[in-house]
């Protein structure tokens, strides 16, 4: 997300663009604040709008200078440093100080890695590699939002050169730009369903959005006229386009779940808005409002500072923040943006204008980057740690080691990534006679109880895939999971086991919305009916939710001073949502001749759930991250399941 380095207002369209920046920013802010009275489930689409705006503005600036024969690539990169670096430097500096004061050492170590990647402007690669299935909640990552900055800066590395060559072939400008856009869009559509993380974070799959802005820039300025004879029509079309975008972001999950095509619709509506906005008299006047203009002018810095503010607010309150605290974070975001703009960005630009030379600006950039890197190293050095662990706290936090996934048989019968049906998974299935044995299917929440169940069950079979629910294809599922479950259904039809267990993180599957719950309920009902059809004698069990804590249970225990003693309980913030999805799915299971195994009823008293359990005399937290069971937790939950199916 960035703004035009040339803030000339010789055209009213610049004011309109600031108004559009304000809209895009507010969508993102409200999405991350997650106000209970206004849940903008599609607010993240504001970043898509920023990509379009960036392509639009950057192309305009470069093309004008190419026509004037005044364009120098060195000048372009210097302008990028002057525009982007001061706000980023101050944000990283302040964020690092607060991280040192508030975060636990293990959290600091993760933060430092993201700090290094953000300083190098490749944080999108870092978060792509580390936003895996077992990564901490993004709500507790102060720099997660800088991925978009990484995408844009990587685009800026090659785009001036590309546009210069395109300028030399001006006769074919539009055709060449369409080739870039179509290639990126095609790859995005091809991979988005099966590889949503990589297509979210990496430039090749975002280039099409930026090139929409590039093409719009060339189209609008080539066809621009000063006439306003069609202003009424333009206002109507632009207004409808804007309302369409707002409707999508407000009711995103009501309209389409896991739909990459909704991105296309949003970008198309935004393109329509940009095209007609140049003649839309009344909408331009609205967007020229002083408050909207101010928000747009501060959009870059406000975007930078909002996520750290929200993260530290959550950490300081153990994840529990109210609507008024969210509103306070919103006000603080704009206050900090104004301070940074007046106290840092504006003076730095004035200095850069006076300094003139490339090497001075570059030297400041290099020196500041080195300072940030040194700061990151220093705050994560145990000798300088603000928080000192006790021996007991070190013991608790040792359970956050993701190596626990080894006990889930990851890579063997618990899969991730692409799925290819075949005999390669035969070892995951017992060779018991038809009509006997137990099958377990689902996502990681099925996998995490597989090992202890295998020890207690004769003729036990298990196959799971991360992020794949044991459900028939629906708007909640993706193609790789549909193929996976089709394979599972074939095995059920072949062997017709005595018992079939379906496990999943159902709350995540419903996306936390009432509409998602409706889709999930219908899908589960259809799945149970399908299994009854192909294996009429099989008994079907649906494994319920397990407790979850954010960002992870060991950190919550350390912050709340909970000792590692068997039987300790810790409050679950989203217990109402967990128990709500349990109640709904238990009804669905009962109505379709299946048994629902309610884990929460056995582990929780009201909203306080069992947080410490023992295995072989050793106490362990129930889960090692937010919701995946430790070895002791596996056996505890497996005991509940075993009692229900015996």
Question: Could you describe each region identified by the protein language model?
Answer:
Residues 2-3, 229, 254, 316-327, ...:
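Extracellular/periplasmic envelope-modification machinery, especially enzymes
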Residues 2-356, 368-374:
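Membrane-interface helix/loop caps of multi-pass membrane proteins
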């Amino acid at each position: 997300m960035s703004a035009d380095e040339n803030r000339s207002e010789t055209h009213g369209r610049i004011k309109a663009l600031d108004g559009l920046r304000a809209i895009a920013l507010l969508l993102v802010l409200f999405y991350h604040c997650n106000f209970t009275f206004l849940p903008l489930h599609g607010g993240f689409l504001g970043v898509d709008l920023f990509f379009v705006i960036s392509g639009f503005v950057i192309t305009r600036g470069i093309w004008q200078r190419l026509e004037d024969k005044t364009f120098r690539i060195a000048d372009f990169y210097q302008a990028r440093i002057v525009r982007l670096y001061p706000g980023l430097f101050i944000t990283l500096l302040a964020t690092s100080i607060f991280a040192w004061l508030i975060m636990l050492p293990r959290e600091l170590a993760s933060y430092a890695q993201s700090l290094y990647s953000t300083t190098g402007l490749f944080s999108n690669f870092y978060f792509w590699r580390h936003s895996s299935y077992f990564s901490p909640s993004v709500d507790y990552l102060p720099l997660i939002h800088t991925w978009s900055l990484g995408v844009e800066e990587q685009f800026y590395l090659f785009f001036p050169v590309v546009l210069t060559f395109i300028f030399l072939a001006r006769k074919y400008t539009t055709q060449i730009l369409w080739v870039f856009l179509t290639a990126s869009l095609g790859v995005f559509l091809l991979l988005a369903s099966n590889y949503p993380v990589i297509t979210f974070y990496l430039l090749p799959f975002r280039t099409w959005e930026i090139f929409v802005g590039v093409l719009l820039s060339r189209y609008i300025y080539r066809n621009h006229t000063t006439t306003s004879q069609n202003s009424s029509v333009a206002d109507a079309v632009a207004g409808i386009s804007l309302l369409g975008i707002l409707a999508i972001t407000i009711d995103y999950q009501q309209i389409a779940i896991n739909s990459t095509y909704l991105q296309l619709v949003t970008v198309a509506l935004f393109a329509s808005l940009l095209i007609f906005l140049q003649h839309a008299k009344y909408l331009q006047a609205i967007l020229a409002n002083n408050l909207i203009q101010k928000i747009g002018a501060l959009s870059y810095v406000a975007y930078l500072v909002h996520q750290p503010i929200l993260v530290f607010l959550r950490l300081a309150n153990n994840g529990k923040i109210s609507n008024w605290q969210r509103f306070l974070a919103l006000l603080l975001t704009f206050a900090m943006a104004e301070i940074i703009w007046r106290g840092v960005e504006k003076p730095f630009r004035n200095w850069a204008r006076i300094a003139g030379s490339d090497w001075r600006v570059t030297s400041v950039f290099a020196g500041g980057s080195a300072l940030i890197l040194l700061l990151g190293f220093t705050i994560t050095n145990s000798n300088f740690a603000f928080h000192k662990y006790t021996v007991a706290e070190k013991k608790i936090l040792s359970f956050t080691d993701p190596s626990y996934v080894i006990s889930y048989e990851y890579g063997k019968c618990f899969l991730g990534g692409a799925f290819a049906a075949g005999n390669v998974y035969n070892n995951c299935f017992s060779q018991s006679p038809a009509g006997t044995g137990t099958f377990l299917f689902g996502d990681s929440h099925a996998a995490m109880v597989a090992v202890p169940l295998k020890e207690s069950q004769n003729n036990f079979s298990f196959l799971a895939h991360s992020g794949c629910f044991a459900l028939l294809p629906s708007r909640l599922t993706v193609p790789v999971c549909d193929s996976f479950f089709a394979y599972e259904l074939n095995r059920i039809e072949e062997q017709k086991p005595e018992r079939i267990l379906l496990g999943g993180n159902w709350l995540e599957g419903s996306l936390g919305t009432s509409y998602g719950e409706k889709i999930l309920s219908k899908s589960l009902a259809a799945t149970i009916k399908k299994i009854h059809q192909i294996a009429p004698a099989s008994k079907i069990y649906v494994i319920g939710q397990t407790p979850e804590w954010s960002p992870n249970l060991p950190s919550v225990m350390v912050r709340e001073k909970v000792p590692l003693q068997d039987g300790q309980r810790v409050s679950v913030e989203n217990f109402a949502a967990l128990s709500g999805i349990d109640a709904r799915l238990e009804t669905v299971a009962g109505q379709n001749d299946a048994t629902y195994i309610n884990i929460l009823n056995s582990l929780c008293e009201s909203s306080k759930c069992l947080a410490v359990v023992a295995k072989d005399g050793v106490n362990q937290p129930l889960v090692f991250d937010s919701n995946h069971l430790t070895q002791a937790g596996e056996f505890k939950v497996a005991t509940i399941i075993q009692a229900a199916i015996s």
